[in-house]
């Protein structure tokens, strides 16, 4: 699954 932290890291790119 995708965690909130993973989404934030991807969005930060």
Curated annotation (Swiss-Prot):
Class of enzymatic activity (EC top level): oxidoreductase
Main location: secreted
GO BP annotation list: hydrogen peroxide catabolic process
UniProt entry keywords in alphabetical sequence: Calcium, Heme, Hydrogen peroxide, Iron, Metal-binding, Oxidoreductase, Peroxidase, Secreted
Domain of life: Eukaryota
Gene Ontology molecular functions: lactoperoxidase activity; metal ion binding
Function: Removal of H(2)O(2), oxidation of toxic reductants, biosynthesis and degradation of lignin, suberization, auxin catabolism, response to environmental stresses such as wounding, pathogen attack and oxidative stress. These functions might be dependent on each isozyme/isoform in each plant tissue.
Protein name per Swiss-Prot or TrEMBL: Peroxidase 8
């Amino acid at each position: 699954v995708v965690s909130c932290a993973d989404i934030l890291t991807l969005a930060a790119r």
